[in-house]
Amino acid sequence: MIIKRFIMKKIVLFLLVSFLLLSIISCTRIAVALTNKKDPFKEKTVWVKGDKEIVFIPMIHVAKAGYYEKVKDFLSQKRNEGYVVYYEDLKNGGTTPEERDTLTLKMRKIIGYHLCGAYTKEENKSTPQYLKKYVGQDMTNTGIDTLKDIRADMTVKELIAKIEAKREKKLELEPCDFETPLNAPYKCNNYKEYYYWFARRYRDDYLSNLLINTLDKKIVVIYGGDHKWRVYPSLMDGDFHLTEGKWYKKKEKSNNVTTN
C-alpha cells in the first residue's frame, strides 16, 4: 500500500508539473511532446453572444507541415463564408534600426533565446535541438492574408514598455548581450521573471479586449493554444456562451457541448 501511494503521488506530481509548464507558453519542449497533434480542430471552440460568433482555434506554433495545410484550407473556407480572420503576429514595433536591435536584445533577455527569424532552422543555434524536425508556423503555411486578415497582437515595443513600467526602471543590456550573436546559445543574465507577462498576460488581455469590443460579427481566431487559459474566461465574463467544443473552467451546458 505504501509503495502504491508513493507511485500515485509521483504520477500526480508529474501531471501537475506538466500542466504548469504547458500553461506558461505553447512552444516549450513539453508542449511539443504532449500536444503536437495532427488535427488542429480537435480543440476548436465556438463562442456566441447575440449575433456575434467567435471560432477559436488553439494553435501549435511548431508542428508537421500537414497540420498547417488543414488550417490554411479551413481559413479559406471561412473567408468565403464571410468570416474575418484574426491572427497572432508579434511584431517588433521599432521605428529605427537601432531601436529594433535594442528591442530584439531585450526580448531575448526576457525569453532566453532569439524568437524571430530562423525559428526551427539549423543555423539558429539558440533554438532547442528538438524543434529542428518540425515546421514553424508562418503566414504562408497558414494562408494568412495580411491585407484582409486582422493582426490581433501587440508589438515587442509595447510589451517592453509595459514591463519597464511595471518594474519602474529600464531593462538593462550588458556587454554579453551585444557580444552574443542572435542565433547562438544565450548564456547572459536574464529577466525571465517577466517571461509570463511578456509571452502571455499582456497579450492575452489585448486579444480578449479586441474580441469582446470588435464590431466584426463572424470571427475566426488562430492563436497559440495556451492563450485560451485567460482568453476563454474573459469571453465568458463578456457574456459569450460556449456552443461548440469543450472548456474546463466553468460548468456550462448548451446544445452539443460538454464541459466539466
Put a short name on every predicted segment:
Residues 15-23:
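Bacterial N-terminal signal peptides
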Residues 91, 227-228:
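Alpha-helix capping/helix-boundary segments
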Residues 63, 229-230:
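Active-site environment of divalent metal-dependent phosphoester hydrolases
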Residues 210, 230-231:
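Phosphate- and divalent-cation-binding pockets in alpha/beta enzyme and binding domains
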Residues 258-260:
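Short, solvent-exposed mixed-charge patches
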Residues 28-198, 202, 208-216, 222, ...:
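Structured, acidic catalytic/metal-binding patches in enzyme active sites
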Residues 2-11:
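Positively charged n-region of N-terminal signal peptides that target proteins for export
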